[in-house]
Curated annotation (Swiss-Prot):
The chain crosses the membrane at residues 24-44, 88-108, 141-161, 173-195. It is found in: Membrane. The gene is TMEM116. Keywords: Membrane, Transmembrane, Transmembrane helix. Gene3D superfamilies: Rhodopsin 7-helix transmembrane proteins (1.20.1070.10). This is Transmembrane protein 116. GO terms for cellular component: membrane. The keyword Transmembrane helix applies. One of its GO terms (biological process) is signal transduction. The lineage of its organism: Eukaryota, Metazoa, Chordata, Craniata, Vertebrata. It is a multi-pass membrane protein.
């Protein structure tokens, strides 16, 4: 009885703490990119680092290689412009690695919690193992979708650090990263839709199996498969988190 009362008294505190952490994470995730890129905009404009070059794509932020510094006006501070160029690349690569690791940690954590929840019921039937398999695939697909979206841009940044001169490979990566960097939401929706389709198939198979089973087996199967419907709402948080990143 004491354990139940203490659990009920601490539950609102835990919920309030979780809400505050989520609000702080939302605010910081909005402010940190602005704070990190403020030196690039401020110092870049005062030092005249960004302007229209002879090649149209060189005016894009973070895509002006050191070789383009020769086209800057005499009043431009080349040392500041070069420092801002490498600073922008470092921020981009660091954000990519941090976002990828965060997505993987959140999804693996959700996968672990769900496995503990299923195993706590004391029964692992065919449906439970099928759902666990879908969750495992989902944990792999979201990081793969994130890497497919931002991988070409990361490869382009790394190649430009080693070979600043523009080549045909650079132009191909320019076009590829322009297409993939804007398709993260589309790929996330594809992974989410595929997962929901698999859940729907499991429900259809459960209904077909129920038609060929005895009343006792039907009641047992309904009892042990109650967690299937609650899983869809439980896994919506990793989906929205991955889309935000």
């Amino acid at each position: 009885m004491k354990h139940t009362q203490s659990g009920q008294s601490t539950s609102p505190l835990v919920i309030d703490y979780t809400c505050r952490v989520c609000q702080m994470a939302f605010v910081f995730s909005s402010l940190i990119p602005l704070l990190l890129m403020t030196p690039v905009f401020c110092l870049g404009n005062t030092s005249e680092c960004f302007q229209n070059f002879s090649q149209s794509h060189k005016c894009i932020l973070m895509h002006s290689p050191p070789s383009a510094m020769a086209e800057l006006p005499p009043s431009a501070n080349t040392s500041v412009c070069s420092t801002l160029y490498f600073y922008g690349i470092a921020i981009f690569l660091g954000s990519f690695v941090l976002s990828l690791l965060t997505i993987m940690v959140l999804l693996i954590r959700a996968q672990t919690l769900y496995k503990k929840f299923v195993k706590s019921t004391g029964f692992l039937g065919s449906e439970q193992w099928a759902v666990i398999h879908i969750v495992d695939q989902r944990v792999r697909f979201y990081p793969v979708a994130f890497f497919c979206c931002w991988g070409p841009a990361v490869i382009l940044m790394i190649i430009k650090l080693t070979k600043p001169q523009d080549t045909k490979l650079h132009m191909a990566l320019y076009v590829l990263q322009a297409l993939t960097a804007t398709s993260q939401g589309l790929l996330n929706c594809g992974v989410y839709g595929w997962t929901q389709h698999k859940f729907h198939q499991l429900k259809q198979e459960a209904r077909r199996d129920a038609d060929t089973q005895t009343p006792l087996l039907c009641s047992q199967k309904r009892f042990y498969s109650r967690g299937l419907n609650s899983l869809e709402s439980t896994l919506t948080f990793p989906a929205s988190t991955s889309t935000i990143f």
